[in-house]
Amino acid sequence: MLAVVEQGSKQYLVRKGQVISVEKISAEPGKEVEISCVKCVLDEEARPHFGVGTVKAKVLAQERGEKLVIFKKRRRKNSRRRNGHRQYVTILRVTDVTL
């Protein structure tokens, strides 16, 4: 089964066994979390079920993502600024998708 879940401010298309990287969740590695904000679930016959279902996932790690570089330049002024940051992310393995 496939499911569209919303975690943080993003939506992910997930299936059982898939590893995804989402915005930080306050849970220790090894814990089981339940994602209740499920937008759509596709069953085996590809019929959509909207607004129902749950997705369970296991927390694999708490990490930091890749560096995002912000570069601002004002043309003809010899003025530029380079800045960057790394977001905290949680690595999840989807263990179950149910209706």
From Swiss-Prot:
Keywords annotated in UniProt: Ribonucleoprotein, Ribosomal protein, RNA-binding, rRNA-binding
Gene Ontology MF term list: rRNA binding; structural constituent of ribosome
GO biological process, one term: translation
A GO cellular component annotation in the UniProt record: cytoplasm
PROSITE patterns cross-referenced by the UniProt entry: RIBOSOMAL_L21
Taxonomy, superkingdom: Bacteria
Pfam families: Ribosomal_L21p (PF00829)
Subunit structure: Part of the 50S ribosomal subunit. Contacts protein L20.
Function: This protein binds to 23S rRNA in the presence of protein L20.
Family: Belongs to the bacterial ribosomal protein bL21 family.
NCBIfam families: L21
Protein name, UniProt field: Large ribosomal subunit protein bL21
Originating species: Neorickettsia sennetsu (strain ATCC VR-367 / Miyayama)
